[in-house]
Amino acid sequence: MTTLHFSGFPRVGAFRELKFAQEKYWRKEISEQELLAVAKDLREKNWKHQAAANADYVAVGDFTFYDHILDLQVATGAIPARFGFDSQNLSLEQFFQLARGNKDQFAIEMTKWFDTNYHYLVPEFHADTEFKANAKHYVQQLQEAQALGLKAKPTVVGPLTFLWVGKEKGAVEFDRLSLLPKLLPVYVEILTALVEAGAEWIQIDEPALTVDLPKEWVEAYKDVYATLSKVSAKILLSTYFGSVAEHAALLKSLPVDGLHIDLVRAPEQLDAFADYDKVLSAGVIDGRNIWRANLNKVLETVELLQAKLGDRLWISSSCSLLHTPFDLSVEEKLKANKPDLYSWLAFTLQKTQELRVLKAALNEGRDSVAEELAASQAAADSRANSSEIHRADVAKRLADLPANADQRKSPFADRIKAQQAWLNLPLLPTTNIGSFPQTTEIRQARAAFKKGELSAADYEAAMKKEIALVVEEQEKLDLDVLVHGEAERNDMVEYFGELLSGFAFTQYGWVQSYGSRCVKPPIIFGDVSRPEAMTVAWSTYAQSLTKRPMKGMLTGPVTILQWSFVRNDIPRSTVCKQIALALNDEVLDLEKAGIKVIQIDEPAIREGLPLKRADWDAYLNWAGESFRLSSTGCEDSTQIHTHMCYSEFNDILPAIAAMDADVITIETSRSDMELLTAFGEFKYPNDIGPGVYDIHSPRVPTEAEVEHLLRKAIEVVPVERLWVNPDCGLKTRGWKETLEQLQVMMNVTHKLRAELAK
């Protein structure tokens, strides 16, 4: 018989119950006991949903109050020593301080979990880090599930992935792999505690196997699993997010009892493991996207596997369902307005039922679930033939693009002369990245307008009032190139998604980004086009208030793609180019309306990098082409800006230069302009605006601090190509500190201009 198990489940609840309880607890509106009760209730509901899908094993240990890697830091005693906390007796309050910081210590750094949009808390390893086991988190959840009469499988991130996703800290140089001999006995203790609590199978997650691991890390798997296999539980080694075919010989040799592979992201790896002689868990339902599976097609694969493996076949989702929204059935608006699209989707609970159907078909025959299989096929057929998805005009436009469609008319050296001829900017021109503070009044007006409580005319008047204020304040500060402040935008992707065809939105399609923060990504379900102008009216109104140049503001195609649930029936590169052409229509309309400085933000270009470096070039080629397609066709005198905010550029600088934006603004203040050095060494050919102060803090920098950064920038970038700007948009700041911060920036700029003019 085929076994059905779950790898992990969303933590926050169908209606973000955990988020709201956490935030009430942080505001001291509920007690710790009340928060614990909400969490216990959510865990029970999650397990019951898994049991209702006829799961043989429910997942335990995956629930967390903040992040599963933070739980592991506590369980192994690897919490940062700088907090002075005892990992053996850590209070919930202290746990949250690790994640959020306190008055004495900054929070543990966050970064993205492999290539997902989930953020984990990065372990801080020192040469002298000591580990100490505390299995309470995992044991408690195992016992809770057992008390409900359920068979449970604890899930723990493995020791090599744990070390891999951490960072070396401290003055002493060392390799974190050297900590393995100290860490391994602690893992043995944790697994032993789980065995003593009744665990039969333990899932150990090693997604690090899907990235380019150095040889010594790969070799280490032999000793690690030789040691862990001595624990008297059965071990399911779980891999996901990509192919592990290159490690097939190693994985087959490890003394574990089963292996999980991701057959959604990497179906081609099945051939490498079809002869595996232990339990093979096939991840066949997508744990990272929201599309209903064609179960008949999936069955073709798993029936062949079952014929080979018999009872050794397990089935599951490709990875934890953490990355998908909870329940499609609550999306009543979507069902009413887009019934076809609704029928093509599957959120977490629907995916559990897809797995139930697959298990029944395998164990009892297809006839036992004939109705469900017919419904799955009908949805797949409807989607394949829908005129809502496939549009001949969009396909033709892409197909008819000439070979040089993504190239500007002239090289940068010619364009910058044409731009400067009319812009007539001083040395060290100043600008803002885009957004200004989103006040309570702005949010209330937007909410009232969406609910129909505020007329379109009144809403427009409220937004224009905010725009006028933003323009006036920038003029008072003497900024050179102005922005309109984006008062009308709730979110930099959602705003455009609502105005482009091929996008849809949910009411409750939340997924956890980190801690209590959840995001509700748009769904790109069909061919993308722009029915009408999206930003022209706002930008031209702002331009009418000033003689200074006004920047048009757009979110770039790659970022819109990365921060959405993307259709899986055509290549992502094709979707990205469709978005690019829709944005290009907007660029040309802005230009026609007299907006001759246009910014196309691409904060997510780096996030899209594939896990394996061999796949980088292909991605960077189509990502760069998409950006250029969005900005092509305009006159040389129109200046295209882009903005990027992340901490590592060196390895993709040629690709960034190939995007050929006239001006790039980047986040650099927190790294003390270190990032800029890479641009200098690379001899980045176009204009650069390094951020001269950190907008993530309300603190107003001193003039000396800003001057220090600007002087460092002048050492690296030719002064005639240097812009001055904050690190990022000002949406999350208050007005008071915003104006004070910008005033400091302007004072320093004026001082250095005077000095350079001598």
Curated annotation (Swiss-Prot):
For the ligand (5-methyltetrahydropteroyltri-L-glutamate), the binding residues are 16-19, 112, 517-518, 563, 607
The answer, when asked if Metal-binding is one of the entry's keywords, is yes
The record's comment on cofactor binding reads:
Binds 1 zinc ion per subunit.
Please tell me whether the keyword Zinc is annotated for this protein: yes
Q: What does this protein do?
A: Catalyzes the transfer of a methyl group from 5-methyltetrahydrofolate to homocysteine resulting in methionine formation.
Q: Which HAMAP family match?
A: Meth_synth
| Listed name of the protein | 5-methyltetrahydropteroyltriglutamate--homocysteine methyltransferase
* The organism's taxonomic lineage, starting at the top: Bacteria, Pseudomonadati, Pseudomonadota, Betaproteobacteria, Neisseriales
As recorded in Swiss-Prot or TrEMBL, the protein's gene is named: metE
